[in-house]
Amino acid sequence: MEKVKQTIRAPRGTELQTKGWVQEAALRMLMNNLDPEVAEKPEELVVYGGIGRAARNWESYQAIVDSLKTLESDETLLVQSGKPVAIFKSHEDAPRVLLANSNLVPKWANWDHFRELEKKGLMMYGQMTAGSWIYIGTQGILQGTYETFGEAARQHFGGSLKGTLTLTAGLGGMGGAQPLAVTMNGGVVIAIDVDKRSIDRRIEKRYCDMYTESLEEALAVANEYKEKKEPISIGLLGNAAEILPELVKRNITPDLVTDQTSAHDPLNGYIPVGYTLEEAAKLREEDPERYVQLSKESMTKHVEAMLAMQEKGAITFDYGNNIRQVAFDEGLKNAFDFPGFVPAFIRPLFCEGKGPFRWVALSGDPEDIYKTDEVILREFADNEHLCNWIRMARQQVEFQGLPSRICWLGYGERAKFGRIINEMVANGELSAPIVIGRDHLDCGSVASPNRETEAMKDGSDSVADWPILNALINSVNGASWVSVHHGGGVGMGYSLHAGMVIVADGTEAAAKRIERVLTSDPGMGVVRHVDAGYDLAVETAKEKGVNIPMMK
C-alpha cells in the first residue's frame, strides 16, 4: 500500500463542494474518516481495526471524491471494496451511494485468499465503519463499552465497578474506549498495549489517565486506587501474551478480564511475543507465514491465561476480536469456556431494538451537538441511564474530527430523535444538516457467530440472511448510503454485516426518509430476535406494533 502524506480534513460550514447535501455528507464523512484526529494510519487510508480502510488505494480515493462532487441528486454511486465502479441514474429517494466491501464467496472467505486479492489490488478490508464512512473516533464504541462494563457491574458487583480491577489489552480505535468506559463505571483498569503511540493517543484524548512501562508500578497504582475505591485508568506498555501469564504465575487475579487486541487479523493486527514493533514489521514483510503462526501461538498463550484467571474467579469475557477461535483452532479445546460480551451482557438491549446510534454535525460547530444533547435530556428524561451517559459524555469525551455524539436508542426512539433533528435543521436551530448513522454492530444488521449472534436461543448464529435483509429494506426506504461488508470485527469468514447512514437536511423529503429508515432499521433487530424466540423481543414487537406475520 502506497503511503501518501497529506492532511485530509472534512470541510466545515454551509458551502457545498457537491450538488446536494446528501452527496456533501458522504464526501465530508469519507474525508472525516481520514482526518488525522480520527484515523489510526491516514497515510495508508487505514481508519481503524488493523487494516480497515476508507478506500482501496489513493487513486480510488480521489476517484470517489471526484465522483461525489459531480453526482446528481437522482444518481447512485456504486463502490466495490473501496473502488468506485459505476454511477447509475436512480431517483431522489434512493441512496446516493451503495457500498459492498470485502465480500467473498463462502468457500474462499479466508485471510489467505483475501490477501491474494488485496495484493492484486482487487479488494480492501472495510472493517465496519471504516469502509462505510461513518467512523467517529473512539467515541463511536464508547457507550457500547460503557454499557458492557455497566451490565457486568450490575450482574456481578452490585451495580458499580468501584473497588474492582479490570485487566484488558488493546488500545486502538476500538479498544481505546475501554479505559474511560471502566472509569465511567467507577473502576480501576490496567490496559495493555504493545504500541506506545496507541497509549499516548488515548491519554492525549483523555480516554486514559496515565502511562507506565512497569508492571510493578501499574499494579501498585491499581491496588492503591482499588483500596480507595476511586477510578483510574493505567496504560501499560507491553505484550498481553507475556503479561497475563506472568500475572497468573504471581497468583494475581483481577476482578474482570477481557481483551480488545486486533486478534481478528493475525498478520496485521497482533504482535507475537518477543518482538518489538519494528522487528514484527520486518518479519511480517519477510516471512508472513511464520509471523501468522507465531501470532497464533501467542494468542493461545493469551487465552490460556484468561482461562486461568477465570478459574481463579475473574469475570472473564471475549470482547469480539475472535481470539477464542484462533486459540481453539490451535488446539486449545476449552477456549470457548468464557462467553462473548453480547450473550453475556448486551443481547437484552438488542431485543428492544437498541444499538449504537450516532450523529455528526456537518457544520463542524460543537454547539450543534450540544443542542442535540439537550434534545436527548428533554425528550428522554425518563431514561436516567441514558441521560447520565449524555451528561458524562459532554464532560469527558473529546471530539475527534467533526463533532459527533453516540447513544444507544431503541425502536421508536431513533425515529423520534431523527424527526426532531430534521426539524431543528429546517428551522435554523442547527447551523447545517446532521448525519445520522450507526455501527454495523447493531441489533439487526450482523451475522457473527463468535460475536453479535453468538449462542442465539434457536441456534441460528450463522444465518446471514438478516444483514442482507437489513441492507435491502434500508436501501428501498431511502437511506443516504448503505453498505454490506464481510469480516468486520472478527475477521475473514466469521461475519457479514450491513450499515446505513441517513442525512437530516431539514427538507420534508428527508423527514419521510428518516421516518421510514429509522423505523425499519432497528425494527430488523426486533424481528431478528423475535424469530430466534426471545420473549423480550416478542413483548417489544407487540408493544410497538411491529408487523411480524408468524409471531405467536
Swiss-Prot record:
NAD(+) binds at residues 49-50, 127, 173-175, 193, 239-240, 260-264, 270-271, 319, 489. The gene is hutU. It is found in: Cytoplasm. InterPro entries: Urocanase (IPR055351), Urocanase-like (IPR023637), Urocanase_C (IPR035401), Urocanase_central_sf (IPR038364), Urocanase_CS (IPR023636), Urocanase_N (IPR035400), Urocanase_Rossmann-like (IPR035085), Urocanase_sf (IPR036190). Transmembrane segments: none annotated. This is Urocanate hydratase. The keyword Protease does not apply. SUPFAM superfamilies: Urocanase. One of its GO terms (cellular component) is cytoplasm. Pfam families: Urocanase (PF01175), Urocanase_C (PF17392), Urocanase_N (PF17391). It comes from Bacillus anthracis. Belongs to the urocanase family. The active site is at 407.
